[in-house]
Amino acid sequence: MAEAQEKYQHQFQSQSPPFPTQEWVQFFPSPSPKSPAGTATTTTSSTKKDEKVKYMISTDPSLLSLSALDSAFTQEYMYWVKPLPAPVLKDMIDRSLCFGVYRCSHSNIANDNGNVGVEVDIDTDADPATARNMDATTNLTQIGFARLITDNVTFAYLTDVYILPEYQGTGLGSWLLQCVNAWVDGRGEYFRRFMMVTVGERAEGYYQRVMGVETQGRKGDVFIMGKKGKGAVV
């Protein structure tokens, strides 16, 4: 009996979270040539006015840039977070289902992503295994992120959603939430509930419209929102 329990415990501890990688690709208008601070930036020759830019959303954790997340976590637009030590940040990523948003560009194009966008360097910043899915002439610049805390069976909580300010207003934020929604709506018969928290009535209306969530409670300007899954009883 003891041997059986020990074997079961070992097998349980060795299992990694069952998060199959999903990817979405879409084209959006090129971002404004203005930086978040309003300082003019130089538009590259490859990004002309009204030109569509290729973006990718992926749940592959090996694509994520920890330095991009660390930079974003220090910005005022992520007012609900504080910077984390690198080992803690990595642990957070490893324990979550993360949606990275990336701008796709050729390697001979300079990064015009402002002061908080960080290119994913296959050799240093991201997992070298990433190279298996990337063209040799393609760079991915991480410009957004969302994170689900989930057991992958009954519950999911959405947090740390952002798109860099210079990329907002192009539809990328709504697309990111739609991709998260696709994952949530694709859960099985035992999935009970999706939850999130946001601040302000404007954000409340936005999430209601894009994700179909309902307000479950409110304290001041803080809204608790969510929606039932297929396995919800109450």
For the regions a protein language model found, what residue spans apply to each?
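Amphipathic alpha-helical interface elements that mediate macromolecular binding in regulatory proteins
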Residues: 67, 71, 174-178, 205
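A conserved beta-strand-loop-helix scaffold within acyl/acetyltransferase catalytic domains
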Residues: 86-107, 114-117, 121, 127-165
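Eukaryotic short linear interaction motifs
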Residues: 108-109, 165-167, 204-205
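Conserved acetyl-CoA-binding loop-helix of GNAT-fold acetyltransferases
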Residues: 163, 169-184, 209
